[in-house]
From Swiss-Prot:
The regions responsible for dimerization and for DprA-RecA interaction partially overlap, it is suggested that when RecA interacts with the DprA-ssDNA NPC it rearranges or disrupts the DprA dimer, leading to nucleation of RecA on ssDNA. The keyword Cytoplasm applies. GO terms for cellular component: cytoplasm. Homodimer; forms tail-to-tail dimers, forms nucleoprotein complex (NPC) which requires at least 30 nucleotides (nt) of ssDNA becoming optimal with 50 nt. Interacts with RecA, forms mixed DprA-RecA-ssDNA filaments. Interacts with ComFA and ComFC. Its main location: cytoplasm. Gene3D superfamilies: 3.40.50.450. Induction: Expressed under conditions that induce DNA competence. It holds the Pfam family DNA_processg_A. This is DNA processing protein DprA.
Length: 282
């Protein structure tokens, strides 16, 4: 079996996890012969090879191929795959996209934070992004709150932005951001490791966050509570060697307790875009 991007998608649809497919691809780099399906089952370490192979053979290739081709994609085997992303733990094997893939070539910074942000939190993000003077592509997750504020600030200041979503590219979540997602997909870039039609399941979003952080040289966080998803994303980013920039907030409402914790752990306190740019070498 030749491992093409379509075959990667088919392996996912047959039940292999991202990590299991990574094992197969890493093994395939070191051997010359094509792998049989039984080899893939063994190498991947899947729990029930018989069930996996049965699912694989039951797939209607004509239907799945049509689904796969609904949006362009690239895999970790392709030259356009970002090096920084390939270096993270559990790097996504396959990404669908809509928009301008050239944005992946430019320096990027991620922005994460609360979905239920305050007006002050949104304005703080807008101020920092405005101060970046379009030197960095803004990467975020198109969620409510801080994510939306980050994408909008980039657009309003004439910059570029990338949205990494936790659904298929033809699914809009939240629905209130449909127009924004369409706009970014037409003029900027939307990425997803989920195939067409895939819905917003809870576990998709922590997985999405690893891509947001992995694409970037640094992560800006605003209004992250303790034990929030944003805090976990930043802690993982620090483990991966990324810079973390925390915007401080009030000590009275608890909305920024996670940011303050990160500052204590070594994140850089930032109040302007210049604070962020000072850490980047161009």
């Amino acid at each position: 079996m030749k491992i093409t991007n379509y075959e990667i998608y088919k392996l996912k649809k047959s039940g292999l996890t991202n990590q299991q497919i990574l094992k197969v691809l890493e093994y395939g780099e070191n051997v010359d012969q094509e792998l049989l399906l039984g080899d893939i089952a063994d190498i991947s370490g899947c729990r029930n090879p018989a069930v996996f192979m049965e699912r694989y053979f039951q797939i209607d290739d004509a239907h799945l191929s049509k689904e796969f081709q609904k949006f362009p994609s690239f895999s970790i085997l392709d030259d356009c795959y970002p090096w920084d992303l390939s270096e993270i733990y559990d790097a996504p094997v396959l990404l669908f996209y809509k928009g301008n893939l050239d944005l992946l070539k430019f320096p990027k910074v991620a922005v994460v934070g609360s979905r239920a942000c305050s007006k002050q939190g949104a304005k703080s993000v807008e101020k920092v992004i405005q101060g970046l003077e379009n030197e960095l592509v803004i990467v975020s997750g198109l969620a409510k709150g801080i994510d939306t504020a980050a994408h909008m600030a980039a657009l309003q200041n004439g910059g570029k932005t990338i949205a990494v979503i936790g659904t298929g590219l033809d699914v809009f979540y939240p629905k209130a951001n449909k127009r924004l997602q369409d706009y970014i997909g037409n003029d900027h870039l939307v990425l997803s490791e989920y195939g067409p039609g895939e819905q917003p399941l809870k576990f998709h979003f922590p997985a999405r966050n690893r891509i947001i952080a992995g694409l970037c040289r640094g992560v800006i966080v605003a209004e992250a509570k303790m034990r929030s998803g944003s805090l976990i994303t930043c802690e993982r980013a620090m483990e991966e060697g990324r810079d973390v920039f925390a915007i401080p907030g009030s000590i009275l409402d608890g909305l920024s307790d996670g940011c303050h914790h990160l500052i204590q752990e070594g994140a850089k306190l930032v109040t302007s875009g210049q604070d962020v740019l000072a850490e980047f070498e161009f």
